[in-house]
Amino acid sequence: MTALEKIIGECRQCAGLFRLGRDVEAALSMVDVFDGAQQLLLSAPADVQQVWAQILTQMLDCQERQDWLALADYMEFELVDLLESVPA
């Protein structure tokens, strides 16, 4: 399993926790997911890093509003799509 596959799996697992209402557990996992994503995206092109910053801002806004379903959607769809778009 590559680092990319691992972080994508963690994104989906964390999103699932938010959907189940396990927001405390999910929030702890989210920190690790964001750290892993950040590491993978450090060497990405500038436009990808800009999209990452926008997605991260949106996810943190969702967390602040306690909109767990929207946060789960951003993690499972927007973030995963971004990670999959990064050239290996």
Identify the role of each PLM range.
Residues 1-88:
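C-terminal-biased regions
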